[in-house]
Amino acid sequence: MHAQDKGGILPALSLLLIAVAMVSPSQAAYKLQERYSWNQLDFAFPSARLKEQALASGDYIPTNALPVGVEHFGNRLFVTVPRWRDGIPATLTYINMDHSVTGSPELIPYPDWRANTAGDCANSITTAYRIKVDECGRLWVLDTGTVGIGNTTTNPCPYAINIFDLATDTRIRRYELPAADTNPNTFIANIAVDIGKSCDDAFAYFADELGYGLISYSWELNKSWRFSAHSYFFPDPLRGDFNVAGINFQWGEEGIFGMSLTPIRSDGYRTLYFSPLASHRQFAVSTRILRDETRTEDSYHDFVALDERGPNAHTTSRVMSDDGVELFNLIDQNAVGCWHSSMPYSPQSHGIVDRDDVGLVFPADIKIDENKNVWVLSDRMPVFLLSDLDYSDTNFRIYTAPLATLIENTVCDLRNNAYGPPNTVSIPKQAAPGHSAVGPPLYTTTNQYRPVLSQKPQTSWGPSLPSRNYLPALNGNPGIPGSRNNLNNLGAPGQVVSSVSVSTNTVGPSGIEVPKAYVFNQHNGLNYETSGPHLFPTLQPAPSQLGGGLKTYVNARQSGWWHHQQQG
């Protein structure tokens, strides 16, 4: 993540930090179960004496460490810690899950301490962000070679992909990105790995967030190339405003970031979905294009633009299962969302699988392992970057749950007739002359997109907030709070829950707060399914005012109260 003080944020933090809404048990969803948590990170030093020396010398500063990436393989859970500040002893680490079933375990450097030496370019990893384990038992780690963040960034080493054999814990390849694949603004934090017909038929794709490009790397050729001449890699100028944990900030320059890959399609290729961070929109391209070095300059029309996900829909991490379910973080909403790739990419086809205004503040990374278990890491990143975390509180959490449990009774669960496409209508993909269309025909459904109104956030974290207990039984145990037998705690299928701060909401005549972003999108022509008053159920009791649902509500922007809010 690239971040810096955006003039005026820091002076206001004493008022803004405050932050997330206090939630009662009836407001929190608990499909994801907490596995590990930390107030601050700790590392497994070889001895207590060496740890004390590192603390005394400043080589280890516990409050400077922030986890950003997670990946699971076998009995190990990998966690990455970028060197954004001084005192980070290791950037690529893991938890031995046999020794630490839960709790706040020490992070063990992977594969060892020497391989985590900052600045030892050829032999070590300086800074790692997101990582990926492939189906061949290899761990792919992109070393950015950077120390610091924003204006403090230095580049002691070049960008390099490191691949480890997890059976032997040895590095089997290191490949430096050539100068032609980067530019002075390059910042790469995300990686997607594409395995084709064999383990040698492997590609990795890197999203250049600030240099606005997409880089392909071929394992077989040991060669890379860059796609850079595409406007889809750039941020949306209307989507650079963020609200996380009550903090309003701007990341308006953040381009292509989150990526996911579909299962292999009938033509032998996958589809890569991606989205800029400062955007609510998703884009797609076939890996047939990305795997072809000759297409870097003439592939503009092979990229496809999809609809917006809906309001408050910034995302940094996404992953797709082998049966086509995409999960992604919704950082403005303290939530994890879903979309089934067999459905149209429209707001009404998106759902919320879990939301927690305390535990899921900035769910930084999401992964699905080979057993279809989902892993989510949350880290309160904006608070860490723009202010100071409260290290007497739990700041970092890793959650897990079976994928089937997460999507059950959501719009993404096609096994449930209530949420499947009861009357599917095949719609051939449309493409202008010379354009390519990606994927199979789409279909429409009668499901509705149901954003809901949010209550005012409180002004403290609140020590009495409910906490998730670690529960080892994750397969639909009736005793799990908020699981299969407590679905009333979950958002309605397809609904998107707003968690924006008070200062960014619009207040209607009933005194209920409505996300301003939703009004803004409607005002600027972004349409949703709006039939029926069920869309804004809290407005139904006053038919004379706004009881006609969202259409009536949106029409209210012509009234005096709406204009007053806009002028104020």
Swiss-Prot record:
Known glycosylation sites: 151, 222
GO cellular component terms, semicolon-separated: extracellular region
UniProt effect for mutating residue 480 to V: In strain: 211RIB/A2
Domain of life: Eukaryota
Keywords: Developmental protein, Glycoprotein, Secreted, Signal
Cleaved signal peptide residues: 1-28
InterPro entries the record matches: 6-blade_b-propeller_TolB-like, Royal_jelly/protein_yellow
Compartments it resides in: Secreted
Gene3D superfamilies registered for this protein in UniProt: TolB, C-terminal domain
Purpose: Controls the pigmentation pattern of the adult cuticle and larval mouth parts.
Family note: Belongs to the major royal jelly protein family.
UniProt protein name: Protein yellow
